[in-house]
Amino acid sequence: CLTLWCSATIDDLNGWERIENNNEFAELESELSNCFQNLTKSLAATFSQVMIVTNEVGYGIVPELATTRFFRDQLGKLNIAVAAISGTAFQVTAGIPVRLK
């Protein structure tokens, strides 16, 4: 699950505390961008078929907390990056798949 991977990566970078205590958004965003690039490069280089599940984050309300807004924005960027290198992409709502790509 890409959502859990993103959350765990932020956790590995001590991101939640950094956002709450120091507002290190730019530095953390740069570190995450590097992690995202490494993931997408690895996915693009594999010869295996990979199915990735993630959460859609663009349809909801703007979160009140800075940490939640940061997470939503980063997951959105990661979703875009992974969809860009994917051969196909579907959005599934209420069990109904809609092909995006």
For each of these PLM feature ranges, what is it?
Residues C1:
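Conserved proline-anchored active-site loop of SAM-dependent methyltransferases
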